[in-house]
A protein has these predicted regions:
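N-terminal acidic leader/helix
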Residues: 3-33
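Acidic, low-complexity intrinsically disordered segments
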Residues: 28-80
Length: 80
């Protein structure tokens, strides 16, 4: 079974990007993540550490976006 996550841009400032993370297969909100553009540190709204594949995949996608100096309004990817 394949799994699909979507991140939706909430905020783009000079210091960070904030995205909502969604489980697209179930159409469920997973969490919100803020990632620093300077050092890739992150803060999750409801957890202290990345705790599932949706959060870790979203974090990797956001780090790639920051490295490319972009902030997509929405991005989806999956695995499985």
């Amino acid at each position: 079974m394949s799994r699909l996550f979507t991140i939706k841009l909430i905020s783009n400032t000079k210091d960070s990007l904030v995205y909502d993370i969604w489980d697209e297969d179930r159409n469920e909100y997973v969490n919100q993540i803020e990632v620093s553009k300077k050092d890739f540190s992150y803060h999750l709204k409801s957890n202290q550490k990345l705790s599932n594949s949706y959060e870790s995949s979203a974090f990797r996608a956001i780090k790639r976006a920051i490295s490319m100096n972009v902030a997509p309004k929405e991005y989806s990817d999956g695995w499985g």
